Design a protein with these regions (language model features):
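Surface-exposed, beta-sheet-biased, low-hydrophobicity segments with strongly acidic/polar composition
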Residues: 1-117, 124
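Short helix-capping/linker turns of helical repeat alpha-solenoids
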Residues: 135-137, 150-151, 171-174, 187-188, ...
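Hydrophobic face of amphipathic alpha-helices that form TPR/SEL1-like repeat modules
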Residues: 143-150, 179-188, 217-226, 256, ...
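TPR/TPR-like (Sel1-like) alpha-helical repeat modules
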Residues: 308-315, 416-431
Length: 475
């Protein structure tokens, strides 16, 4: 869990001096133990504009401040939502308020849920990471592993994540079994091989131990059905509705799963109703779902509105907004439009990348390499972004980097690197790279992955050459 310890008030100002345009910040801190209902907050305010701020209420979840007849809440659990919906008129002050908090390692569902998604993990601060590193608790091992695996902050983060997950699993952390199962799906373990049998073994053990992360992932798999699970959206719907009706502390992202199930059952109105409820309860994944439903209705205004709301709430996926803008439309604008769009795109994609969104790395890499959308051509930046996208498991980054390096690959080692990037692209979901993967395999560039390729990536047996057992479709 995370517990808040201090209220911080920052007042930004600059002197009333025509010759001085510098902005300054006055910071005042209040200890949680000193805050109580009715307390008047005294703080440095050179402008004298904000007086009479009182504490309305204090709880472990945050606090509510009053200013005249207006109320302002700071929610520790879901920062983008007010603390309650009791008809209160929450209004933002024109100053910066935030809670300083510290992560508390606990063997509780609430603690583990903080590390289920990239958006949640992206909220971790340096002090949080140091606290996790200093802890020997199995729960901290799992949490630190998720930070490494979902954000890939270091070159060996994948190996570190696996080590931490195995340590946590040995100590009995159910969610660690689920985390390891997901690594086998993408070939991210030390074996460097996609292995669905191992994935299922670890997943089933996680489910048997009561892992909510495993239940969440398995429910999502069963909505559409795949190699990992049967297609049964009606069963998922019933399971999640029961969960929402009977559990008192529900993880908000279950609303997104229920909405997905209704969408798969061709009930878009019900799906939208559930997604809206999810937003109200703190789900971040419901924002892009509502945005895409608006796009399907060709309602661009509502689409943009939901994407912008998602960004404000901290949904990393929403930062790809306008990522599909083509060069022709960009060039049709005037210079002011181009400068504005180019700057906004770069800032937006950088923010998404900091939240672990590999697709943002792809956009940054693509435009840095091609010089499109007003980006300056910079191959060094392009390679840096694309390699980050590869580390984050983005199939488009893998494919583009392979395309770029293929034209420059002269040595056997360089050609093998390109082939491995193609394999990663296919592992991460880019099916249209499978033809080239097959050719790389026939050329002997992927012999060490023979078992995986023949089991998962080649067609039926009648397409295999009897002499060498390889795919003969391109002979």
């Amino acid at each position: 869990m995370r517990q808040w310890t201090r209220l911080i008030i920052d007042v930004d100002y600059h002197p009333c001096d025509p010759g001085n345009s510098t902005w300054y910040c006055e910071r005042t801190a209040f200890s949680k133990s000193d805050l109580c209902a009715g307390k008047v907050l005294s703080y440095e305010d050179p402008g004298g504009l904000f007086g009479g701020i009182r504490v309305d209420s204090v709880s472990e979840d945050g606090l509510v401040l009053s200013y005249g007849t207006k109320l302002y809440s700071i929610n520790m659990k879901h920062p983008h939502l007010p603390l309650d919906k009791g008809g209160r008129d929450y209004t933002e002050f024109e100053l910066n308020l935030f809670l300083e908090s510290a992560i508390v390692v606990e063997d509780t569902p609430a603690f583990y849920r903080q590390f289920y998604t990239r958006d949640q993990v992206a909220r971790l601060r340096g002090s949080d990471i140091r606290a996790l590193e200093a802890s020997d608790a199995p729960a901290a091992r799992f949490a630190l592993g998720r930070w490494h695996y979902l954000l890939m902050p270091e070159e060996d983060s994948c190996a570190q994540a696996e080590k931490l997950f195995r340590e946590a699993a040995e100590a009995g952390v159910a969610d660690a079994f689920s985390a390891l199962s997901m690594m086998y799906v993408y070939g991210d373990t030390r074996e460097d091989r996609l292995d669905l049998d191992e994935m299922v073994r670890w997943r089933d053990e996680a489910l048997a131990r009561g892992s909510e992360l495993a239940a969440y992932r398995y429910a999502r798999n069963r909505i559409g059905g795949d190699l990992l699970a049967p297609k049964e959206p009606d069963v998922v719907r019933d399971e999640v509705e029961k969960r929402l009706a009977t559990e008192t502390d529900v993880w908000p992202e279950w609303y997104a799963v229920l909405g997905d199930a209704y969408a798969a059952l061709d009930k878009p109105e019900k799906a939208r109703e559930v997604y809206l409820a999810g937003v109200e309860h703190g789900s971040l994944r419901c924002y892009p779902e509502l945005a895409m439903m608006a796009r399907e209705r060709e309602d661009d205004k509502e689409y943009r509105s939901w994407m912008e709301k998602g960004m404000a709430a901290g949904c990393g996926w929403c930062f790809i907004l306008d990522g599909d803008l083509d060069e022709e439309r960009f060039q049709a604008g005037d210079s002011r439009f181009k400068n504005l769009v180019s700057r906004q795109f770069q800032e937006r994609f950088e923010q998404g990348l900091r939240r672990g969104q590999g697709l943002c790395a792809y956009y940054l890499g693509f435009h840095s390499f091609t010089g499109t959308l007003g980006f300056t051509i910079d191959e060094e930046d392009a390679f840096r972004y694309l390699r980050k996208g590869v580390a984050l498991g983005d199939c488009y980054s893998c494919s583009l980097l392979a395309d770029i390096l293929e034209d420059r690959a002269e040595t056997p080692a360089a050609k093998k690197e390109v082939a491995r990037l193609r394999l990663k692209a296919v592992r991460y979901g880019k099916d249209d790279d499978r033809e080239q993967l097959a050719q790389d395999y026939r050329d002997g560039l992927l012999d060490e992955y023979r078992d995986e390729i023949e089991e998962y990536w080649l067609p039926d047996d009648d397409d295999v050459d009897e002499d060498d057992g390889r795919w003969d479709a391109y002979a």
